[in-house]
Amino acid sequence: MKRYLIGASLALSAAIAAGPAFAQATLSQVKARGQLACGSNTGLAGFGVPDDKGNWTGLDVEYCRAIAAAIFDDPTKVKFTPLSAKDRFTALQSGEVDVLVRNTTWTMSRDTQLGLNFGPINYYDGQGFLVRKKLNVSSALELSGASVCVQQGTTTELNLADYFRANKMKYESVVFATSDETVKAYDSGRCDAFTTDASGLYAERLKLTNPADHIVLPEIISKEPLGPAVRHGDDQWFDIVKWVHYAMVGAEEFGVTKANVDQMLKSDNPEIKRLLGAEGKFGETIGLTNDWAYRIIKHIGNYGESFERNVGAGSPLKIARGLNGQWTKGGLQYAIPIR
């Protein structure tokens, strides 16, 4: 027993000693490379899509730019790798990307079986259905016997089966490998309905030949907590990815914006002072400079600003805040205290 305890103690000591060096691996690699490798969508309006000049925009894209701003004080130091639903986890597991921010649903199997950690939920979503108005359908419960276009390898495909089985309805699943293929098939008339996350329905509807001819049905059939993912084994990197989101949400709560962040440096509010690095050394605890959150807000803005310009009232999608509003206004976005 004594020999066992000594051996266990030595093993624990070795693990503790090795821990910090391993924990810094991703951050060190990102700094040495000079840019963040971000896994993004292949093209989803409002979340991750390149414009005509190849510049990436979207809510998820700005999450990655915020990470780069925190590290480099430069939101442009990001390489975006477009990934399909089928390839996204492999790319993260293999080290091709440092972080995956690609409207990905956090589920138990993904969290416990893929060697990944999921960060804060940057968009609370739920699965819905898009149909043609001429189908004269006002509820998903009227879709019995319908053909439904769905993307392969997604929680969407599984939820679709669950919903129709639970409601004792028949349907034909028409499956495609990519989001673009799925949308094009629906637009061409291959299917009666198209299903994905509700945010995606509003985004993809913009791509249709006649967007006004299609409606999103009222039913939300699932919970889709969307957020970033990182590999297991690097707690410091996981902390960085988490706290970037919390900083943006906290900034919105305290009224700190891209426009007033310099003025807010003079605030007497201790929470704002800690957020912006004017008090305490919280940046150092995650391997960053103490003005890491100031950098994020100066370059990107707070969570509300990012939401509004990408998917909210200031965007073509015009999605209401809903569950993604601040906790003080009936939403679920809630910043962990910096103290």
Please provide the spans of the model-predicted regions.
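Bilobed "Venus flytrap"/periplasmic-binding protein-like clamshell domains
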Residues: 37-46, 56-71, 105, 125-181
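Sec-exported extracytoplasmic/periplasmic mature domains
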Residues: 31-32, 68-73, 93-97, 134, ...
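Bacterial N-terminal signal peptides that target proteins for export
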Residues: 1-8
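Extended ligand-binding regions for polar small-molecule ligands
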Residues: 62-65, 69-71, 134-137, 141, ...
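Acidic, polar ligand-binding/catalytic clefts
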Residues: 65, 69, 73-142, 199-220, ...
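Cleavable N-terminal signal peptides
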Residues: 9-11, 21, 30
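Extracytoplasmic small-molecule ligand-binding "clamshell" domains
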Residues: 23-101, 288, 303, 326, ...
